[in-house]
Amino acid sequence: SSDYTSGRINTAGKFSTTYGRFDIRAKLPKGRGSWPAIWMLGENIGTVGWPLCGEIDIMEHVGYDDNGIHASIHTKTFNHGLNTQKTGYTTLSTATDSFHVYSLEWTPNYLRFFIDQNPYFFVYNDSNGDVEKWPFDNPHYIILNLAVGGDWGGAQGIDPTKFPMKMLVDYVKVYKKTELQTDVNVTFSVDMKNVNTNGTGIYISGGNIS
């Protein structure tokens, strides 16, 4: 039997989506051995398996690196099993002392990751339609978890004096971009008598926009 129990909640079967802005305000746990994560998995994992389904790690933290914050993507081509995953890293001195907003901006063309509105990791879609490189045109669901130990979180052991460990989540917000009218018809009529020419250019004044 295991000495520790990890906790997870997810939206599988309840909420999945493609593209948008995802904001999660959270305070991370202290202690060597903790491994909190805010991430997403492709809802087709049951049929195509991992990593072809795609994985987006909005935030990962390991307790032995107090200030380190990671963001990653995993696909069939780019994943930790092959040691080819695409990963961003930054430091946040108050990650375990204060709440911060961890964000993902997901479009058909890129994934961009933020902490408190500050971007620190960007992945551009240069797959040319290859789903093994970019499975992120399919719906994903959200996962919030606090693991204890494991290959990464437990790489330097577990500090039993830090229990109980808690990852506190204030909110999870998802925003979808609305469709905007991009075609605007403009007619600009000019009285050509109001034309002035000098050494720097031609200036036309007066007119009506309709």
Protein language model features and the residues they cover:
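GH16 jelly-roll
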Residues: S1-L180
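A short, amphipathic beta-strand motif
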Residues: I24, V184-D191
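Short amphipathic, basic-aromatic surface patches that mediate peripheral association
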Residues: N44, F188-V195
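Polar low-complexity intrinsically disordered regions
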Residues: T178-T182, I204-G207
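Short coil/turn motif common to extracellular beta-sandwich-like domains
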Residues: Q181-T187, T197-G199
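Aromatic-rich carbohydrate-binding modules that target alpha-glucans
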Residues: V195-S210
